[in-house]
């Protein structure tokens, strides 16, 4: 997942 992207931050």
From Swiss-Prot:
Alphabetized UniProt keyword annotations: Amidation, Pyrrolidone carboxylic acid, Secreted
GO annotations of cellular component type: extracellular region
Highest taxon above the source species: Eukaryota
Keyword check for Secreted: yes
Main location: secreted
Subcellular location: Secreted
Function text: Functions as a regulator of the biosynthesis of TSH in the anterior pituitary gland and as a neurotransmitter/ neuromodulator in the central and peripheral nervous systems.
Recorded family membership: Belongs to the TRH family.
Protein name: Thyrotropin-releasing hormone
Organism: Sus scrofa (Pig)
